[in-house]
Amino acid sequence: MKKESQVIFDRNVVEFVTVAAEFCKFLEQAETMKRDTFVDTLLKILPLLYLKAAMLPETEIIGDDAPESYVTEETYEVLRINLAGILAEKDDYLDVFIQDMVYSDQPIKKNISEDLADIYQAIKDFIFVFQLGLNETMNDSLAICQEQFKEYWGQTLVNTLRALHDVKYRQSEEDEPEDDDFEDEGESDCHGHDHGHCDCEKDLNYGY
């Protein structure tokens, strides 16, 4: 007699499946997206995905056979290349919180696109099996996805989130005019002449 899992009907599982499916769909359709939109959306989806994964009930494998895999090497590589194209020069980042740091005292260069493809692979394999609707394999795919979350893709998600945060907000800082430098120059120009006739404020273009 086959074992039946009740865990797969848990509310937290249903919510995780919903967010996970949206995450996969977003990455699959992101090829022509502008980088700003892509980064902004991921900064909202990834924390939610982590939260829903962390709230999953403990699940144990009940079947004898491993669930099918959906993501092939080709699928993975096509997605990674598409994401790298969106991020362009912002794809690389330095990471210090990975296992390889045990053997090195220098930060390791990572790629946001590769991290996202790694997360996608684990999530998509789970979603593919779960949507087939077979109780035992649904349960086992959930158990595997949960274990992979604990072992690697949860940490990968957090690392990627930090890198994406840097892309969004450091880029914003770089785009802002360096007012301090202008002010310093302005102050030096004022020295030695009548401030009543100084046009320094007029020279500083604040946009109004």
PLM regions and their residue ranges:
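Long amphipathic alpha-helical segments
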Residues: 58-127
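Short, Lys/Arg-enriched, disordered terminal segments
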Residues: 1-7, 203-208
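N-terminal interaction modules that seed assembly of large macromolecular complexes
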Residues: 2, 7-73
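Acidic, proline/glycine-rich low-complexity IDRs
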Residues: 107, 122-208
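Conserved aromatic-histidine-acidic binding/catalytic patches
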Residues: 4, 8-11, 67, 71, ...
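Intrinsically disordered or highly flexible coil/loop and linker segments, enriched in small
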Residues: 33, 55-62, 89-96, 129-136, ...
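Context-gated lysine
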Residues: 2-3, 25, 34, 44, ...
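Charged, amphipathic alpha-helical oligomerization/scaffolding segments
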Residues: 11, 15-22, 41-48, 52, ...
